[in-house]
Amino acid sequence: VSASNREILIDPLVSLDKDPVVGLRAAATAAQLGLPLSLDSFTSLAEKLKKGEGALTNPWPREARELLIALIGAGESMVDIFETLDQEEIIFQWIPEWMSVRSLPQRNALHRHTVDRHMVETAVHAAKLTRKVQRPDLLLFAALFHDIGKGAQEDHSERGVRLIEPIARRIGFDSKEIEIVKNLILHHLLLSSTATRRDLDDPATIQSVLTAIPDVNTLELLHALSIADGEATGSAGWSDWKATLVNDLVHRVKRAMAGAEVAPQPEVSDEQSALALKGQLRVSVQEHSSGLAVEVISPDKPGLLSIVAGVLNISRLDVKSARTKTIGSS
């Protein structure tokens, strides 16, 4: 592999059977240096691979796996390289399962890219977060394949777990690493959906994440994957508000993993109790970085929470969580 005229070349005399990782080496080098691949070199590589030359062993040599991770972790410059590998049908020689998501349209209108391009973009965003996790290689690998289960009439996360195991094993990850990757793919929507749809003050909310995620390292990997996935989806699927909620959820789960009480319910203050016992309506609003906290003290009645939520909805305010407390008999 060499650079000439600001592009990466593969020696035409190289034997793929003697050096089967040369294609991955060239792709990773190009991505890391931000240089394009020589089209002639990769057309020739594709033809040789289709003839059965240079087939990688199962499992892959360690160098091949490391080069794949280097390619995935190169950031924005890997997009064009991966596109070339796709157009020349080289990626399918290494990872045949990629064919099932090639140019696959999304069912969710929030997405701005096809399934395959979205996964590539997720890897680009994940590359920015590798210093925040203990196993950047597992983060990058999971990012590139987190939606591999799409394209069938079943839950794509569950199908993705079945598909990723043979891929990860073939690429050379060990059983423990594969279990982590499977967990990330199965639960890649968990943090976002939990943070935005459930009350973070409810102990059951925190417990649901604790049940799914076994340790802090996996939680941090899942957090980074959630951010990368959201950012790759676009502004319609990710925002500062959602990021704040996810961060809050992760912080609470980490505290629980460290042995802290799970989401303790705050006590009602003496002032709040006194106001409630007066039986008069009072509404107060406090502004926080993540939104508004609206406190409503009112005589109880059937449907009170729905009435309050309806008023907020009419005012074009989204209710992200709610907590109620009844004092006395009314």
Give the residues covered by each predicted segment:
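Short acidic (Asp/Glu) and glycine-rich catalytic loops that position anionic groups and cofactors
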Residues: 2-7, 42-49, 59-65, 97-105, ...
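Conserved phosphate/pyrophosphate-binding and hydrolysis machinery centered on Walker-type P-loop NTPases
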Residues: 16, 58-61, 71, 75, ...
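Non-catalytic, well-ordered alpha-helical scaffold segments
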Residues: 17-28, 62-69, 79-83, 88, ...
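Active-site-adjacent "gating/activation" loops or surface patches in catalytic cores
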Residues: 2-8, 87-148
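Divalent metal-dependent catalytic cores for phosphoryl transfer on phosphate-bearing substrates
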Residues: 114, 129-255
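Regulatory modules associated with amino-acid/nitrogen control
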Residues: 1-8, 80, 203-330
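Short coil/turn segments at secondary-structure boundaries
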Residues: 38-45, 60-65, 79-88, 94-101, ...
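Non-catalytic interface/linker regions that flank or bridge core catalytic/transmembrane domains
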Residues: 1-109
